[in-house]
């Protein structure tokens, strides 16, 4: 007998990578091994030297096919085993450097359903009722997409992902799922696999999933990926939380440059955001760059929430940056990742 292994990877499309997958039939008793693909068709290699390598890094049961079938998330490498479009390696390296601090993450992944070029459930002409009743709402026409959300949630559970919850978001057609609490790069692995499952399940309904930061211009909420972060030190005391919050304010441009496409469109100071170029932090403040949950402020220990990452962010880059900035500050080191150069695209000057 044999089983099906769905090899899943992140391609090299810019500025937002796409997810790709293909099926391999493997004999029972054998594990998924490295495989290959045509990188010239995924923006990861030239046509004259197009072979790329898929190296398995994370496997789960396949909740769609069932049985003994598997999902296999892969790193992409060239045939010399270097990873030019693979950001997972950066997250792994900095996580190992500060492993003694136990940096951990929970990510709130927002997204928007689309059908026929409009947010799912919106009228063919015009707009739905203003924002207000949709966030965590219930009832009929207000909550389009719930069937997909329910199937996705169960699929994540069946796959063994660390899904913590789901909810409808502020704009009609917008939802969220949460993954955590996990270290890096495992949190990135599970976010990417959760995204793939969402795309795959939405296919069955003729619905598309968008992770665009500001899918609809105007007086509508954007879509983010609020990233909750803790270390052994922050879980033990308030001073470490303050150190992390202050450290994040010293590298504003470095962070927002790598927090996803369209950061200036979403982080405007409206719709529960802080301006992208003005850093702030505070307790219970959803208009701050970094929020301290009320329970954390009361206990004087716990975690912080960076509200700046977009829904389309690369979780490997975001977690690598947060570990580098926060843990280096706690250790009295200098951060080493993603120091801007003349070739680094960045928004205009940021301030604290």
UniProtKB/Swiss-Prot annotation:
Q: Name one Pfam family in it.
A: Gln-synt_C
Reactions that this protein is recorded to catalyse: L-glutamate + NH4(+) + ATP = L-glutamine + ADP + phosphate + H(+)
- Note the SUPFAM superfamilies from the entry: Glutamine synthetase, N-terminal domain (SSF54368), Glutamine synthetase/guanido kinase (SSF55931)
Q: Which UniProt keywords apply?
A: ATP-binding, Cytoplasm, Ligase, Magnesium, Metal-binding, Nitrogen fixation, Nucleotide-binding, Stress response
Query: What's any GO biological process attached to this entry?
Result: glutamine biosynthetic process
The coenzyme or cofactor needed here is: Mg(2+)
InterPro entries this protein is in?
A: Gln_syn_GlnII, Gln_synt_N, Gln_synt_N_sf, Gln_synth/guanido_kin_cat_dom, Gln_synth_cat_dom, Gln_synth_gly_rich_site, Gln_synth_N_conserv_site, Glutamine_Synthetase
Major localization listed first in the record, in broad terms: cytoplasm
Function (record text):
Catalyzes the ATP-dependent biosynthesis of glutamine from glutamate and ammonia.
Q: What is this protein called?
A: Glutamine synthetase
Organism, by scientific name, is Frankia alni
Which gene specifies this protein's sequence?
A: glnII
């Amino acid at each position: 007998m044999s089983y099906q292994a769905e090899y899943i990877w992140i391609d090299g499309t810019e500025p937002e990578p796409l997810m790709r997958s293909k099926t391999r039939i493997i004999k029972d008793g054998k594990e998924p091994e490295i495989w290959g693909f045509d990188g010239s068709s995924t923006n990861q290699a030239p046509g004259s030297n197009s072979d790329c390598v898929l190296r398995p890094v994370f496997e789960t049961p396949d909740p769609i096919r069932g049985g003994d079938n598997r999902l296999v998330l892969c790193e992409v490498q060239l045939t010399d085993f270097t990873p030019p479009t693979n950001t997972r390696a950066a997250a792994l390296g900095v996580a190992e450097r500060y492993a003694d601090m136990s940096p951990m993450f929970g990510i709130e992944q927002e997204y928007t359903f689309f059908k026929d070029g409009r947010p799912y459930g919106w009228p063919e002409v015009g707009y739905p009722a203003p924002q207000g009743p949709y966030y965590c709402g219930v009832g009929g026409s207000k909550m389009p997409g719930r069937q997909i959300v329910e199937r996705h949630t169960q699929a994540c559970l069946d796959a063994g992902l660390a899904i913590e919850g789901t909810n409808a978001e502020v704009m009609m057609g917008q939802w969220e799922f949460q993954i955590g609490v996990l270290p890096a790069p495992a949190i990135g692995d599970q976010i990417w696999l959760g995204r793939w499952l969402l795309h795959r399940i939405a296919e069955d309904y003729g619905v598309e999933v968008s992770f665009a930061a500001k899918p609809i211009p105007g007086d509508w909420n954007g879509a983010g990926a609020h990233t909750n972060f803790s270390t052994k030190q922050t879980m033990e005391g308030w001073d470490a939380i303050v150190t992390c919050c202050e450290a994040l304010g010293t590298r504003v441009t470095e962070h927002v440059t790598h927090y996803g496409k369209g950061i200036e469109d979403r982080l405007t100071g409206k719709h529960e955001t802080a301006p992208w170029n003005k850093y702030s932090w505070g307790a219970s403040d959803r208009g701050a760059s970094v929020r301290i949950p009320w329970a954390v402020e009361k206990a004087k220990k716990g975690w912080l929430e960076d509200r700046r990452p977009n829904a389309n962010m690369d979780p490997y880059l975001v977690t690598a940056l947060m570990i580098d900035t926060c843990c280096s500050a706690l250790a009295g080191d200098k951060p080493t990742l993603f120091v801007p150069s003349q070739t680094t695209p960045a928004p205009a000057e940021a301030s604290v």
